[in-house]
């Protein structure tokens, strides 16, 4: 006999329970702190959440959330997203920046693109990546410093792991979006911005003056995830990301990664969950 259909409300509850477990494991992995699922919100955690709430509610603070080259990032992302931008145009852009050259060649030699022979020349690397791979690589180089930005002890300790998660997540989100007929570049940039919100979150946690260790429980993990989603909407506006990305970010900011969300939000959800699982069980320990 066919299995009974799970009511939508119950399905959402089951999804939320699974999401909470992954959020807890991920936060413990990111902070390199032991997880205690039932840990309550202690004084230090409550102070951190209050500071994040004040940050989200303060428009004057939004311009200083993350470092940003105001005259560079928005027009560059718009150019990358423009379908009329030719591969030759992007190639010229890359050739002018040694950091971009190195990253393009590195990506062309990654497991995703690897060929039988090593790629050592820029022209060959660009042929291997194609226009979509090149767009993603340029966006990655431009936005990575915004995620790796300097902070206190906690952010410094977590930066390497945060970028590992970000790198996996952005590529997974792009792949999921592409497979469902949506814009892969929008999904890629949205994932980068979503994890940039973690940088802001960790920097805020670093400002909490308390010597007590962090209590990493489900309640704290879920509360941080909600505030990360609120911050995503702010960051998308501040960076002047493409309009479609800002709209999706606003939805995430209002409703989180909901089970009944729009398709672009579900792509972000899928990439985030899978990247977290991969990091929790296969990343650095």
Name the predicted role of every residue range.
Residues 1-206, 214-285:
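Conserved alpha-helical "signature site"
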Residues 211:
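Catalytic or ion-translocation cores adjacent to nucleophile or general acid/base/metal-coordination motifs
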């Amino acid at each position: 006999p066919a299995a009974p259909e799970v009511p939508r409300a119950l399905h959402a509850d089951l999804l939320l329970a699974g999401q909470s477990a992954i959020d807890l494991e991920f936060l413990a992995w990111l902070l390199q702190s032991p997880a205690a699922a039932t840990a309550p919100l202690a004084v230090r955690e409550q102070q951190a959440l209050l500071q994040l709430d004040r940050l989200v509610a303060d428009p004057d603070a939004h311009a200083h959330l993350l470092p940003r080259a105001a005259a560079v990032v928005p027009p560059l992302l718009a150019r990358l997203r423009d379908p009329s931008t030719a591969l030759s145009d992007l190639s010229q852009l890359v050739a002018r920046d040694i950091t971009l050259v190195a990253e393009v060649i590195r990506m062309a030699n990654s497991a995703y693109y690897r060929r039988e022979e090593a790629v050592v020349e820029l022209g060959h690397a660009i042929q291997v990546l194609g226009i979509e791979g090149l767009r993603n690589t340029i966006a990655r180089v431009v936005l990575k410093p915004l995620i790796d930005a300097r902070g206190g002890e906690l952010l410094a300790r977590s930066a390497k792991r945060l970028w590992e998660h970000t790198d996996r997540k952005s590529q997974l989100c792009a792949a999921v979006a592409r497979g469902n007929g949506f814009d892969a570049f929008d999904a890629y940039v949205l994932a980068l911005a979503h994890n940039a919100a973690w940088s802001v979150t960790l920097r805020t946690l670093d400002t909490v003056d308390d010597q007590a260790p962090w209590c990493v429980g489900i309640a704290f993990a879920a509360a941080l995830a909600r505030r990360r989603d609120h911050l995503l909407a702010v960051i998308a506006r501040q960076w002047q990301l493409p309009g479609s990305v800002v709209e999706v970010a606003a939805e995430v900011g209002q409703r989180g990664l909901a089970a009944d969300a729009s398709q672009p939000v579900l792509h972000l959800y899928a990439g985030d969950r899978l990247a977290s699982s991969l990091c929790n069980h296969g990343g650095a320990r």
